[in-house]
Amino acid sequence: MVRLPLQCLLWGCLLTPVHPEQATACKGNQYLSGSHCCDLCPPGKKLVNDCTGITETECSPCGAGEFLDTWNRESRCHQHKYCDPNLGLQVQGTGTSTTDATCICHEGQHCSSDACESCILHSPCAPGLGVKQLATGVSDTVCEPCPVGFFSKVSSALEKCHPWTSCDTKGLVELQAGTNKTDAVCGFRNRMRALVVIPITMGVLFAVLLLSACIRKVAKEPENKALHRKVGWQDPVETVYPDDFPGPHSIAPVQETLHGCQPVTQEDGKESRISVQERQ
């Protein structure tokens, strides 16, 4: 084995080229551009030009309706989210240069997905089911079956199951048991039913008779007033014939009338006429 002199080894080391290692680690808010660590653009601004050995990173603000919410080296800003009313959305928060706009669903609707790009109506709970958890803007209604002793007879996204009516607490008897869709039916006992129905029936009949009597009385009042008015306008007229008195008398009848409560006798030889009624 040939041994090289120590001097050759030393010269070999000196002649070996030494290449400087490039810097690859930059600070948290920097990025590597070529051989330089450049500063990232702050939220609300986008990158225009990278830094150089003599210039800093050049950034510009986002335009109207745009935003960037992180430190970045983006050349374009993001557009604000559009809350489309045709999809059931409305604006919850207006976007800025550093935050996006937020949307929520109209009342009675919730987001169809986690991204909330559209809304759908809350699901109602069918009869026999009650609401366990109300729907929110991001979640649908949660329903549960009505347990024994409870019922729900409507389709609703708001109502819970209702308890059956307690007939005992009302002093009644249960005529029909409740189900998960119908309430219990209560009623009177046979004797109690008679005690309640008879007074009610008598009261109704009495009211009908009283009303009928009042109607008749009111209907007769105009007739009575008209009759009294007609009698008051006429003067009493009385005709007296000669045959009513004994003794001789002339052949021609003598007519006597009462006029103003004074007797008036027709003269002999004049034609007998019935007096004309005079009115005051």
From Swiss-Prot:
What's the domain of life for this entry?
Answer: Eukaryota
Q: What's a GO cellular component annotated to this UniProt protein?
A: CD40 receptor complex
**At which residues is glycosylation annotated?**
180
Topology check: give the Extracellular ranges.
Answer: 21-194
Does the keyword Membrane feature in the UniProt annotation? yes
Q: Where are the TNFR-Cys repeats?
A: 25-60, 61-103, 104-144, 145-187
Q: Record's CDD domains?
A: TNFRSF5 (cd13407)
Q: Per UniProt, which keywords does this protein have?
A: Disulfide bond, Glycoprotein, Immunity, Membrane, Receptor, Repeat, Signal, Transmembrane, Transmembrane helix
The record lists its disulfide bonds as: 26-37, 38-51, 41-59, 62-77, 83-103, 105-119, 111-116, 125-143
Cited PROSITE patterns: TNFR_NGFR_1, TNFR_NGFR_2
What stretches pass through the bilayer?
195-215
Q: Does the keyword tRNA-binding apply?
A: no
GO terms (molecular function) for this protein are:
signaling receptor activity
Write down the membrane topology. Answer: Single-pass type I membrane protein
Q: Which GO terms describe its biological process?
A: B cell activation; immune response-regulating cell surface receptor signaling pathway
Q: Which residues lie on this side of the membrane: Cytoplasmic?
A: 216-280
Looking up Pfam families in the UniProt record yields: TNFR_c6
Give the location in the cell: Membrane
Leader peptide range in chain numbering: 1-20
Q: What does this protein do?
A: Receptor for TNFSF5/CD40LG. Transduces TRAF6- and MAP3K8-mediated signals that activate ERK in macrophages and B cells, leading to induction of immunoglobulin secretion.
**Quaternary arrangement and interactors, per the entry?**
Monomer and homodimer. Interacts with TRAF1, TRAF2, TRAF3, TRAF5 and TRAF6. Interacts with TRAF6 and MAP3K8; the interaction is required for ERK activation.
Q: Which PANTHER family match?
A: TUMOR NECROSIS FACTOR RECEPTOR SUPERFAMILY MEMBER 5
* Official protein name in the record: Tumor necrosis factor receptor superfamily member 5
Q: From what organism does this protein derive?
A: Equus caballus (Horse)
